[in-house]
Amino acid sequence: MKTGKELKPGTVIRIDNDPWLVQKAEFTKSGRNSAIMKTKLKNLLTGYKTETVYGADDKLDDVILDRKEATLSFISGDSYTFMDTTDYTMYELNAEDIESVLPFVEEGMTDVCEAVFFEGRLVSVELPTTIVRQVDYTEGSARGDTSGKVMKPAKLKNGTELSVADFIEIGDMIEIDTREGGSYKGRAK
């Protein structure tokens, strides 16, 4: 059992026998009212999304999910096929099922992912917390602007855009933190 104040992004809870993924959780406490947790939830079976408010002391059933290592095998339109690294079983997911990691999924990637199962059914895939990708396009460095942390926009091979350090050039390999939507960590070593 979890309480409302323990909810955080990535937590899975059970509502009406369905697993719901907490995508966003915001704790609010005002002077007069009791503490509440505002959440954005996604049903892992149907993909339905909703916003719900829980009291800080509300009791919620947490869900234990099975996890297996998998790699991306191939992409066909909006269908992504992953292969279990131990028994080579193939699993297929739609783009909506993996929309949180979709900006960092690309053909030919070698990252070992975690396939997430609920009662034997594949419901999502999680990437490692740090991945390495190649910068496909970025502007040149801005001369003279060296005060503080200078960032500029860059585009990856699959079209994903993010901010990178000013010294990064086209073709450089960069590390990306995949939590919270993905952010630049540094140049890959």
UniProtKB/Swiss-Prot annotation:
Any Pfam family the entry gives: EFP
Record-linked SMART domains: EFP (SM01185), Elong-fact-P_C (SM00841)
Major place of residence: cytoplasm
GO biological process terms on file: peptide biosynthetic process
UniProt keyword list: Cytoplasm, Elongation factor, Protein biosynthesis
Cellular component annotations (GO), alphabetically ordered: cytoplasm
SUPFAM superfamilies per the UniProt record, alphabetical: Nucleic acid-binding proteins, Translation proteins SH3-like domain
InterPro entries: Elong-fact-P_C, NA-bd_OB-fold, Rib_uL2_dom2, Transl_elong_fac_P/YeiP, Transl_elong_KOW-like, Transl_elong_P/YeiP_cen, Transl_elongation_fac_P, Translation_prot_SH3-like_sf
Membrane-spanning segments: none
Molecular function terms from GO: translation elongation factor activity
Source organism, top-level taxon: Bacteria
Cystine bridges: none
Subcellular location: Cytoplasm
Entry keyword Protein biosynthesis: yes
Pathway named in the protein's UniProt entry: Protein biosynthesis; polypeptide chain elongation
PANTHER family: ELONGATION FACTOR P, ELONGATION FACTOR P (EF-P) FAMILY PROTEIN
Known function: Involved in peptide bond synthesis. Stimulates efficient translation and peptide-bond synthesis on native or reconstituted 70S ribosomes in vitro. Probably functions indirectly by altering the affinity of the ribosome for aminoacyl-tRNA, thus increasing their reactivity as acceptors for peptidyl transferase.
Family affiliation: Belongs to the elongation factor P family.
Annotated protein name in UniProt: Elongation factor P
